[in-house]
């Protein structure tokens, strides 16, 4: 066997430079008993918990690979539900930061998550148009609600009734009866997508936000209240003065007429509209926990805040209005003998008042509201430019003014990072964007310097790591001092964008290339500072090489004899540095070369192009050694690992790949970024790689000591592709359901397939062991003595348990959320054995609840085959008897426990009442004593 080249694996080390991703929503979370101080923010595949007071990241909820799209804290504040791009939902504990519960049911990104009032159920809406209700306590799905024709945008539980209301991009608002999982009402009064909805006024009013500047209000009348004869007729609210009889309002009246027969549980009628100041669509619509503050925003940077008055406040307002109207009427009819009859009508504007506007520093992506203990309204915003802002507002004042109380900025750039560099000691990392330069400590990932700059395109640390040079989009060179964090000098270098710079190997100067078709050579020099007597670093231009095309990239050879220049005409030209004479032309790319690098020994040059290819050339003759199809989109950056012929490429396909330039092999792919990668940097030691992407994140990759074998890597890649294909296969057909309609809550994943395989293996083992035991009994009978039975090593590893107990342990080991899907994949040939074993287990009273759940599901999906199988008839008869008796026993035990808990509750309440009265009497006695003491003091003074 020949020697194989050994590579070392690079792994993801950390994500930094990111405050919050744009796809998800920001929410307040309760930590350490404090409300309003901590917020959870989506950060690519993770969730960051930020302390708003200190501006620090205090907890990271680790995700897998998919991007976070939705967050929802539980009512008790102990858990956080997180929805992902692939449709998965994970529930994290905010105490430990671990995600123990995973729900897989949606086929597309999760768009909405909402807990019910007690936190026992979770409703999730998705881009796959389905709504799924999950049982959080049992860690399983309850049912899937199908009806929307486009992505679901919002789902809300009603507090007092077992109902759910959902909105979607299909312009529909649907009401669901959760007792029978049926959509009993569809509201079709919207002409555009419904982006949000809230319930206010004790759930008797629904407010919806669509793709226009209106917030529509709908009155909800519940059946029980309509049927109650003692209930007075609700007041008819007039529509806003600005709303005419539009075709939409006609539609809503037609809808009301047509749906009278459908009003089994409730009826909806349009109450009017509130006009927003923004003209674009509603992005987010929310109400605070008190139900008094309503807020919404569009695609701009303004949050509009409204106050919803209570019945008493509205009545008070109406009384004032009526009094004013009567006074006016009396003045107008002073000559008439009879008092005129006056009446006032209540409009929607009397009930919902505009309070204030909160203007943020950038476009709002999401927000959340909370009331502080002092009564102030706090609004936290996740902005488009990687920023979190907190505003406070006292809504009780006549003209409240929002005040910005906190801001998290230092942890990231406001725009995409376009250039990265490592210091010579591998410790500092420079990142530069459109408005600022940041210096990061690689070990702590903390930002240690922030300096304002122009739109940066390229950068490097000056030898000595005390200064940095930036090349900008306007063609300037900017020189910064790191110790003071100041701009030393700005030099006009090029007439167009300065696309690339390369430090000379002798470290005395550098070369720049720009869009003005020029390559310029610069030397470092010391000049006297005007503001002080000390000398400072500066640069001076020495030579210029004029070319026929825009320069995109420049690179020195390590011996400083050659200079490679990439041009807009898709070629790379190589020149002698000393004479600037032409040496080689490297042509073959179909689109311009965006990046290139020369190996440490000067033997190879690798070029990456917008045509998605990487070409490896020899620098001696300019021959192309190999052309590699590297990425699925443009190759944006290319760097050799120091002192090797290995190089990294970064592409717009969100991937970083490592290649061997000698063997022309793909070594590994570093996946993590969710959008285009703009740049990367390799540390001088080669141990670290840092990359920047359009998803605003900076990622650090670290070289481990783990050897990477290419054959194993290819095998792992094939396994991953197979697992992906298994998950994409169609669901097994269930009798009674049409093809393509899946009303079960789960979906087929590789985990459910593996769970089904574990059940099959356990049943096979049970069959084998049962046969062995029969043989063993026959041998013992023939021998007339007890012969030792060989023990199965698997059973011995589980504590020398019986084969049937091993089957039960296998069922108990399957996740609750994956149980139904695993049973759905299980072939029918194993079902008779499973039913027989279930009968044994239930008779002994083992895990009755779990086994009944499995049993009823198997009976449901294999009903036809089970009933037609004569051999299973006695088993089913026995199961019928045992399940009824054992379930009753469990029911009785639960009833007894509930009665016991009720008794304890009453005892505690009685004790607390006694304590309350005891405290009250002691307070009264203390007050009497104080009064007596005061009287004595007064008497002594007199």
From Swiss-Prot:
Record-level GO BP terms: ribosomal small subunit biogenesis
Repeat (WD) residue spans along the chain: 21-60, 63-102, 105-144, 147-186, 189-228, 277-316, 412-450, 452-490, 493-532, 546-585, 588-629, 630-669, 672-711
Region (Disordered): 230-263, 723-742
Subunit and interaction comment: Part of the small subunit (SSU) processome, composed of more than 70 proteins and the RNA chaperone small nucleolar RNA (snoRNA) U3.
Keywords in alphabetical order: Isopeptide bond, Nucleus, Phosphoprotein, Repeat, Ubl conjugation, WD repeat
PROSITE patterns: WD_REPEATS_1, WD_REPEATS_2, WD_REPEATS_REGION
Entry keyword annotation includes Acetylation: no
Stated family: Belongs to the WD repeat WDR3/UTP12 family.
Domain of life according to the entry: Eukaryota
Comp. bias regions, Acidic residues: 247-260
Pfam families listed in its UniProt record: Beta-prop_WDR3_1st, Beta-prop_WDR3_2nd, Utp12
Species for this entry: Mus musculus
Localization annotation: Nucleus, Nucleolus
Alphabetical list of SMART domains matching this protein: WD40
Biological role: Part of the small subunit (SSU) processome, first precursor of the small eukaryotic ribosomal subunit. During the assembly of the SSU processome in the nucleolus, many ribosome biogenesis factors, an RNA chaperone and ribosomal proteins associate with the nascent pre-rRNA and work in concert to generate RNA folding, modifications, rearrangements and cleavage as well as targeted degradation of pre-ribosomal RNA by the RNA exosome.
Glycyl lysine isopeptide (Lys-Gly) (interchain with G-Cter in SUMO2) crosslink, residue number(s): 473
Protein name, per record: WD repeat-containing protein 3
Keyword Ribosomal protein: no
GO cellular component, one term: nucleoplasm
């Amino acid at each position: 066997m020949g020697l194989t080249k050994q590579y070392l694996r690079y792994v993801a080390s950390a994500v930094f430079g990111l405050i919050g991703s744009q796809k998800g929503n920001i929410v307040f979370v309760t930590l350490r008993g404090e409300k309003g101080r901590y917020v959870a923010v989506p950060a690519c595949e993770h969730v960051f918990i930020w302390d708003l007071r200190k501006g620090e990241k205090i907890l990271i909820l680790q995700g897998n690979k998919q991007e976070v799209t939705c967050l929802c804290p539980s009512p008790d504040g102990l858990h956080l539900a997180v929805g992902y791009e692939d449709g998965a939902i994970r529930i994290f504990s905010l105490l430990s930061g671990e995600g123990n519960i995973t729900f897989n049911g949606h086929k597309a990104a999760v768009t909405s998550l909402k807990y019910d009032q007690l936190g026992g159920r979770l409703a999730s809406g998705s881009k796959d148009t389905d709504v799924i209700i999950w049982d959080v306590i049992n860690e399983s799905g309850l049912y899937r609600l199908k009806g929307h024709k486009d992505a679901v945008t919002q789902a809300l539980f009603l507090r007092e009734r077992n109902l759910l209301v959902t909105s979607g991009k299909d312009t529909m608002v649907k009401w669901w009866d959760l007792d029978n999982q049926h959509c009993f009402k569809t509201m079709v009064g919207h002409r555009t997508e419904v982006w949000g909805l809230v319930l206010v006024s004790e759930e008797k009013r629904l407010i919806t936000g669509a793709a226009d500047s209106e917030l529509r209000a709908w009155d909800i009348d519940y059946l029980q209240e309509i049927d109650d004869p003692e209930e007075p007729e609700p007041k008819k609210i007039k529509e806003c003065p600005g709303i005419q009889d539009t075709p939409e309002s006609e539609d809503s009246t037609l809808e009301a007429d047509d749906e009278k027969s459908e009003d089994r549980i409730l009826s909806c009628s349009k109450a009017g509209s509130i006009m927003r100041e923004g003209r674009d669509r509603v992005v987010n619509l929310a109400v605070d926990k008190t139900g008094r503050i309503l807020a919404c925003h569009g695609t701009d940077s303004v949050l509009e805040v409204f106050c919803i008055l209570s019945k008493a406040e509205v009545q008070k307002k109406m009384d004032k209005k009526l009094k004013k109207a009567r006074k006016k009427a009396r003045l107008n009819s002073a000559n008439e003998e009879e008092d005129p009859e006056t009446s006032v009508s209540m409009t929607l504007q009397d009930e919902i008042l505009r309070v204030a506007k909160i203007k943020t520093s950038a476009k709002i992506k999401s927000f959340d509201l909370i009331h502080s203990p002092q009564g102030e309204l706090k609004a936290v915003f996740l902005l488009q430019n990687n920023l979190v802002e907190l505003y406070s507002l006292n809504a009780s004042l006549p003209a409240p003014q929002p005040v910005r109380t906190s801001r998290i900025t230092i942890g990231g750039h406001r725009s995409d990072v376009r250039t990265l560099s490592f210091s010579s000691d591998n410790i500092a990392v420079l990142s530069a964007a459109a408005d600022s330069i940041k210096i990061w400590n690689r070990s702590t990932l903390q930002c240690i310097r922030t300096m304002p700059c122009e739109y940066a395109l390229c950068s490097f640390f000056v030898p000595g790591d005390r200064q940095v040079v930036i090349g900008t989009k306007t063609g300037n060179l900017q020189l910064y001092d790191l110790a003071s964090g100041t701009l030393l000098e700005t030099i006009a270098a090029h007439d167009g964008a300065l696309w690339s710079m390369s430090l000379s190997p002798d470290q005395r100067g550098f070369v720049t290339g720009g869009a003005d078709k020029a390559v310029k050579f610069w030397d470092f020099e010391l000049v006297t500072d005007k503001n002080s007597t000390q000398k400072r670093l500066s640069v001076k231009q020495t030579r210029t090489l004029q070319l026929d095309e825009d320069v995109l990239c420049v690179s020195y050879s390590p011996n400083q004899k050659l200079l490679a220049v990439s041009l807009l005409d898709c070629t790379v030209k190589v020149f002698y540095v000393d004479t600037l004479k032409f040496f080689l032309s490297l042509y073959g790319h179909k689109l311009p070369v965006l990046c290139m690098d020369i190996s440490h020994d000067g033997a190879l040059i690798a070029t990456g192009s917008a045509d998605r290819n990487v070409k490896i050339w020899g620098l001696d003759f300019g021959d192309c050694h190999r052309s590699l199809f590297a990425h699925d989109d443009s190759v944006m950056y290319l760097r050799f690992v120091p002192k090797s012929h290995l190089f990294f490429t970064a592409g717009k396909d969100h991937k970083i790949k490592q290649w061997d330039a000698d063997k022309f092999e793909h070594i590994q792919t570093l996946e993590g970024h969710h959008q285009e990668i703009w740049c990367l940097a390799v540390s001088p030691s080669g141990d670290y790689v840092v990359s920047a992407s359009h998803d605003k994140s900076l990622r650090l990759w670290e070289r481990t000591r783990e050897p990477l074998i290419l054959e194993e890597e290819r095998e792992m890649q094939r396994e991953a592709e197979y697992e992906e294909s298994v998950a994409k296969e169609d669901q097994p057909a269930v009798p009674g359901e049409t093809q393509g309609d899946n009303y079960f809550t789960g979906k087929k994943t590789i985990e459910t397939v593996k769970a089904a395989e574990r059940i099959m293996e356990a049943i096979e083992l049970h069959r084998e062991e049962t046969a062995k035991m029969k043989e063993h009994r026959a041998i013992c009978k023939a021998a007339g003595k007890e012969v030792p039975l060989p023990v199965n090593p698997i059973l011995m590893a589980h504590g020398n348990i019986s084969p049937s107990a091993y089957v039960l342990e296998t069922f108990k080991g399957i996740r609750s959320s994956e149980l139904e899907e695993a049973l759905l994949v299980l072939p029918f040939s194993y079902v008779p054995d499973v039913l027989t074993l279930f009968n044994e287990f239930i008779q002994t009273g083992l895990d009755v609840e779990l086994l009944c759940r499995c049993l009823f599901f198997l009976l449901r999906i294999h009903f036809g085959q089970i009933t037609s199988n004569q051999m299973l008839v006695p088993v089913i008869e026995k199961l019928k008897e045992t399940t009824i008796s054992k379930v009753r026993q469990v029911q009785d035990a639960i009833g007894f426990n509930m009665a016991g808990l009720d008794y304890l509750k009453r005892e505690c309440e009685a004790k607390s009442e006694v304590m309350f009265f005891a405290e009250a009497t002691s307070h009264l006695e203390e007050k009497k004593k104080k009064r007596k003491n005061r009287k004595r003091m007064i008497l002594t003074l007199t």
